Amino acid sequence: MNPLASSAIPAVRERDHVTGSNNPKLTLIEYGDFGCRYCFAASRPVKALLDRFDGLRLVWRHFPVTELHPRADLAAELSELAGLHGKFWEAHSLLLTQHGRFSNDDLLSVARRLELDRAENQAALRERRFRERVLADIEGGRRAGVHATPTFFVDGERLDRPWADLAQIVPARLAAA
């Protein structure tokens, strides 16, 4: 049985948050939730893969599960504001380590650590300036069959095995590329 299932995953877009290779042989797309402990757990092995393999790139798309992680949508919106200042991946790391603690004070603390302007941050979250961007990622994930986080796609195919299996799948796919 193929651990990678076909899906309707959107191609990598200009607005996506991307790290890793500028000339990738393999693309991982992760639908994630900053409040999800499994997304936090997956972040270190995925980072290790990015550090190990030059031909790998990672795309993050938001999929906050607010029923389980209240205010994870606001954390996603904060990361979008950080992205405007070239600090998305720094925000990504900090927000994952919050383990779902996303009170106003928690989010302000993260924004302060990112050296984001306090007034801009407060206005962006109050006005929900990035809500539509986050909702678009969620809708794209739903169309692609995402139901839980983290969900990974390897070159457009959904990984239907535990995310830990990426440690075997990525090297094999890169070797075949």
Predicted regions and their residues:
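N-terminal/domain-start segments enriched in small and hydrophobic, helix-friendly residues
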Residues: 4, 23, 164
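A short beta-strand-turn-helix
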Residues: 8-26, 50-51
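A structure-centric signal for secondary-structure junctions around beta-strands
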Residues: 23-25, 75, 148-149
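C-terminal cap of thioredoxin/glutaredoxin-like
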Residues: 9, 31, 38-48, 109-177
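Glycine-rich, flexible loop/turn motifs
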Residues: 14-15, 22, 59, 64, ...
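Structural alpha/beta surface segment adjacent to cysteine/selenocysteine redox centers
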Residues: 27-118, 176-177
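Short clusters of hydrophobic/aromatic residues that line enzyme substrate/ligand-binding pockets
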Residues: 18-19, 102, 125, 159
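N-proximal helix/coil linker or "cap" segments that precede and/or mark the start of modular domains
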Residues: 1-8
